[in-house]
Amino acid sequence: MKVSLPAFEKAKVLVVGDVMLDRYWVGPTGRISPEAPVPVVKINQVEDRPGGAANVALNIATLGGQVQLAGLVGEDDTAKALTLGVQALGVEPQWLNIADKPTITKLRVLSRNQQLIRLDFEESFDKQDSARLLKQSEALLDSVDVVVLSDYAKGAIDKPQDFIALARAKGVKVLVDPKGSDFSRYHGASLITPNMSEFEAVVGAVTSEADLLEKARGLLNKHQFDAILVTRSEKGMTLVTANAPELHIPTVAREVYDVTGAGDTVISALATSLAAGAELPQACAIANTAAGVVVGKLGTSTVSRIELIEALALHHGESGFGVVSEDQLAYALEQAKLRGERVVMTNGCFDILHAGHVSYLKQAKALGDRLIVAVNDDASVKRLKGEGRPVNQVDRRMAVLAGLAAVDWVVPFSEDTPQRIIARLLPDLLVKGGDYKVEDIAGGAEVIAAGGQVQVLGFEDGISTTAIIQNIMAKQ
């Protein structure tokens, strides 16, 4: 599957659910307590991170999406800490403060990157508190494309059926990270994302792949879901929809340090991708890759757009180097620019690669970090050079160029000039060899208009493909 990122900045998402503060006490341990057989930890670091629905919102914001967050909190210092935590990433929360309840807090004690104990400070919110929260959130539906219901069974999401129905009636997709054994509470949702344990808590033990699909489709029909995405740890994810074959997505995590917040990452990446216009299979692949990144971090964490681009490149091969398609190159170029790399581009027929070409390409590469070589295809070379050319077919010409240390990407084009492909890719620097004037170089005007530069480089005298061909023919 080809996977590329949509325009996350266009995504408008509302997150409603159980917000909490994840607090970490961290320090070394080197002895056992004389009072009980437990380690003694000397705390030297305290860190607060937004968790639950708040972590979902922060993941969306980190990816570049526009997000609103609604949840239940107490009137305490923890609520203030949680507010500061989400505001730090530009999220303005819509809290409903409940005077007689504490803000949910999960305190973890860590030593040597291992969690020793977790202490929970919480009381479930009342049904009327949930009703007030959902009613308050209805006013936000007109300004978003996707809603995420992040349910941790702490009371914020009690009976959301009316809220789901209203959102769907307004054309807003509703994604649910479910909890508990009663999925009827989410009737009519666009997509639910249970993990395997949550799925089996509702449908019973899954005995085979066929059994999983049968039970998932049963839930689709029973509760009028559009889709179910079952997250399956080391087995990846399985997407089941009513009108398409199932989609199995293998896991991409290389190392797993901590699964805390992985479900939040999945649903946030799904929501942001769908709100930005991605199709569901593509959104699932993006979410799967994001989860693979976050489980490699310790504690509740987010995934940045750059981290996601790099992970997609690694696991889906869409921005590898060498001979690439134009679409693959556009994606690779986006990644390179996000890394702050200066991209140089040149073009030519390169029919018989010679020392002059090699010297020229070395000069071009020295002007930046990455070098693109656009190559005329065979029909284009024939139109430009006449009968008998090219001597080498385009796939062979590109393979030789791709083998040069100076060249990062080689891409073909079919027109007589590379103006169109240059205008699409817009490198930082466009170079051309010979005695051209800058204003006469194809694509130069577009590069300059976009803030780039155009430069003419010299060729070595006396070396050309035409001269080589004439010399060979003269010796025959």
From Swiss-Prot:
Q: Where are the transmembrane segments?
A: none
Lineage top rank: taxon: Bacteria
Chain positions covered by the region annotation Cytidylyltransferase: 345-476
Catalytic residues at: D264
Any one Gene Ontology cellular component term annotated for this protein: cytosol
Alphabetical list of SUPFAM superfamilies matching this protein: Nucleotidylyl transferase (SSF52374), Ribokinase-like (SSF53613)
Catalysed transformations (reactions): D-glycero-beta-D-manno-heptose 7-phosphate + ATP = D-glycero-beta-D-manno-heptose 1,7-bisphosphate + ADP + H(+); D-glycero-beta-D-manno-heptose 1-phosphate + ATP + H(+) = ADP-D-glycero-beta-D-manno-heptose + diphosphate
Description of how the protein assembles with itself and partners: Homodimer.
Q: What does this protein do?
A: Catalyzes the ADP transfer from ATP to D-glycero-beta-D-manno-heptose 1-phosphate, yielding ADP-D-glycero-beta-D-manno-heptose.
The identity of this protein, by name, is: Bifunctional protein HldE
Q: Which organism is it from?
A: Shewanella sp. (strain ANA-3)
